[in-house]
Amino acid sequence: MRVFVCAALVLAAACGSDSGSTTPTSHNKSVDVFALSSAFSPNFVQIAPGDTIRFNIAPAQNGEGHDVTFDATTGAPANIKVTLNGVIPRVFTAKGTFHYNCFVHPGMSGDVVVQ
């Protein structure tokens, strides 16, 4: 009888549930947005909190640089000053819709939706 009880206890312990002791991994992604001559491409991006947008900036056809200026919205990332070349990342941590413009080129704008 003792052997049966011990075997039952060992079997029950082996069938126990997972304690969830594994560390969850982050699955944040990065999305590239390109500042073309007079447009952002893509000009609409939908991401999750913690994701990164990499703004790829190159000179416009006339040699002018670009800026990325976000509307004054709570949670918006820092603006990007006028630059000629570079890949400038911005991490979006807050949920919401974040509209941005290039003031060097009127009409050049985009939106990031974080949900």
Give residue spans per PLM region.
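Sec-dependent bacterial lipoprotein signal peptides
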Residues: 1-14
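Extracytoplasmic copper-binding redox domains, predominantly the cupredoxin/blue-copper superfamily
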Residues: 15-115
